Amino acid sequence: MKIDYLKNNPREIQLEEDLPPYMTEGVANDIAEIFSTPLSGAYNWDYTVQDNRIKKLYELGKELNWNVEVDVDWSRPFEPLTEPTPIFWDDYAPYQKFSDDKKVEFLNHRIAWSQSQFLHGEQGALLVASQLTSCAPTYNAKLYAASQTFDEARHVEAFNKYIQTRTKLMYPIGNALKSILDKILTDPRWDLKFIGMQIIIEGLALAAFQTSRELTKDPVLRDMLGLIIRDEARHVTFGINYLEEFVETLSEDEKEDRAQFAYEACWLSRERLVSMDVFEHFGWNAEDARQFQLNSDITKHFQKLLFQRVMPNLRRIGLLRDSVVGKFEDLGILEYAEAKSDADIDWADLSRPLFEESA
């Protein structure tokens, strides 16, 4: 065992020749960044099993388990992008100067960057879920958080295998996503971890996974995302149903504090789409490219798809308070708050078999 401890996360891009072997019998060189949190755990001594929605979601999690190595057919060929495709970057002068080969390289790097953020985000979810197992105060919540921890481990495994065996290009975590995860992981308040992860991070991830699944031409990624989406839908539903009741028990000052945190996390999340490392890798003015991307119609449309998932859920749990309404309006995402939330459970949909039975 060899572990290198770093003060900050690595910023290097790992090209195919830089990636470690996906699986090795040799000694792995692990790279670890330490974070500290004044986390207070909680025993639960009555072990009362409430026959409620949380219990049903936990049972579904046990029933709908899947195996990354077995339930995804990895043998299908991978076909990377080989020709430029129409994209909003066509209107950006530095991109216009690229040859077709350079455009293809840029687009493949953008895809790899997005998939890398999925991987890093799922590791963050894994760490938060493990914290919630310890600090959630109720029996059902502990059991569900434990089952979610295993789900998140499976998602990390899936994205890691996909990147290392198919994309073969890995980017470091983006600064915006890292900032959100640092805040959630190091905060001592367990319910803030719930809000940050179950409502915002998981809600945004669910929307992003659904969009990626619709757009990808790779059947392996499509199948993999389909399985991950089933897990994530349960996670978001768990968070809303648990927090809706808990937030009511908080004082007005505590509710205000959580509402401000939710706003700040959403503000940072707008930057999750911006691949600053890719811009810098290709020698662009990163801030100029950032502004171009944020102002593009396709980015605004994608932001809408993402926050249509988050804003109604914040409203449902009582964190869309008067003090933050104007701030959300300035972000341009308040209008999505009246959409349908994920609190109303479609049990038939959540309970569907993972795989269609063959005739």
PLM regions: where:
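Amphipathic, well-ordered alpha-helical segments in soluble domains
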Residues: G121-V128, H155, I201-A208, H235
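Terminal targeting/low-complexity segments that flank the catalytic cores of oxidoreductases
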Residues: M1-S130, S134-K142, T165-P172, A176, ...
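Carboxylate/His-rich catalytic cores and anion/metal-binding grooves
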Residues: T138-K168
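A structural feature that tracks compact, well-ordered secondary-structure segments
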Residues: L126-L132, A145-S147, L206-S212, M224-L227, ...
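C-terminal helix-coil-helix/basic helical segment that borders enzyme active sites and/or dimer interfaces
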Residues: L243-S251
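Outer-membrane beta-barrel domain signature
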Residues: R154, F159, A233-R234, G239, ...
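Short, solvent-exposed positions on alpha-helices
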Residues: Y139, L143, P219-D223, T237
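Active-site-proximal alpha-helical scaffolds that flank and shape metal-associated catalytic sites
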Residues: K161-A233, D257-L268
